[in-house]
Amino acid sequence: MAAVWRWFVPERPSFYDRGLLALTFSLMGIGLMMVASASIKEGPGGDMFYFTKRHLIFLFVCLGIGVGTLYLPLERWREWSGRLLVGALGLLFAVLAVGRTVNGAKRWIGFGFFNIQPAELAKLALIVFIASYLVRRSDEVRGNIAGFVKPLAVVFLLAIMLLAQPDLGSVVVLFVCTFGLLFIGGAKLVQFIAIIVAGLSALAGLIIYEPYRLRRVTSFLDPWADPFGSGYQLTQSLMAFGRGGFFGQGLGNSVQKLSYLPEAHTDFVFAILGEELGYFGVLVVLFLQLLLAMKALQIGRTALLRSKFFEGYMACGIGIWFSFQTVVNVGAAAGMLPTKGLTLPLVSYGGSSLIAITMAVAILLRIDFERRLDTSHVIQREAA
């Protein structure tokens, strides 16, 4: 216990947020454990640990990319914000041109062993771009409708490419992050009301237009009306939670993962966690996810108070992204929201999601590091 206490409360000031690092590694560890358990019947060729080995490789790749991101000065992100967005648009276009189709959706670009899902990288690229835009055009955003609409035009362009895949879940994430950042940036409330009404109308139209989306919504409202058809996945997920009780069936003892619950190691890994670790495990993971999002928002608030607006907007955008995606994934697994195909941050299987989220965490660590470094320099100057 003493060693743990010294880790979180070091005797000498630390130049990085140990709590954020501990949260990240804890969620990664839980994710590896649950992917190993949930995917044990899914591997091709009879390899029970196929997805576990791939997930472990993804984690090592993520750590390498995270370290590289940590060494990148934040000013570079600001300088490259436009190029990152153009790169994300290029990758989304490439998906439509040469992407792989899985379960009726064309969302991945195949590179042999590894498939890239550009939608995950587009989320981070958009947050960086919007943060840069708010710094460059802060008066315009606060003063007139044009400054509010311009970033939304960028999101609409991304949304068109994502809907062609189709990937409505990522579109919703992009709009929520953009609205959140515009609100923090000082946009007028009346502008939000008008755009939100228009957005909800468009969302309803998209749901009605595509039969599979309409089936998802109707099955979410009453999954037991068609438990072996459109409501099958959700009813199996609810049964997993029901079997888990308070303390679960024990790690590895899930029944629903045995070919009953589709996508058990990706979109519905939270349901398997509930079955094996019970509501106790569910609360632990939700608490860790809440702390992760709060850490991001706290880092953002501190940066904004110190007039580090680009860094503050980026951190707040990342916090909104993490929290909203967690709510949607958990809500879909628990039958409170329609399924959207979004991962549970740092827990679900998926290399592109892990890479994007690890890069985002590394950016948070870098923001906090530069803040601590500035504070240290101020103290040294005052002492001199």
Curated annotation (Swiss-Prot):
The chain crosses the membrane at residues 20-40, 55-75, 84-104, 111-131, 144-164, 167-187, 189-209, 268-288, 317-337, 344-364. Residues 1-19, 76-83, 132-143, 188, 289-316, 365-384 are cytoplasmic. Pathway: Cell wall biogenesis; peptidoglycan biosynthesis. It is a multi-pass membrane protein. Its EC number is 2.4.99.28. GO terms for biological process: cell wall organization; FtsZ-dependent cytokinesis; peptidoglycan biosynthetic process; regulation of cell shape. It comes from the Bacteria. It is found in: Cell inner membrane. Keywords: Cell cycle, Cell division, Cell inner membrane, Cell membrane, Cell shape, Cell wall biogenesis/degradation, Glycosyltransferase, Membrane, Peptidoglycan synthesis, Transferase, Transmembrane, Transmembrane helix. Belongs to the SEDS family. FtsW subfamily. NCBIfam families: ftsW, PRK10774.1. This is Probable peptidoglycan glycosyltransferase FtsW. It comes from Tolumonas auensis (strain DSM 9187 / NBRC 110442 / TA 4). The lineage of its organism: Bacteria, Pseudomonadati, Pseudomonadota, Gammaproteobacteria, Aeromonadales.
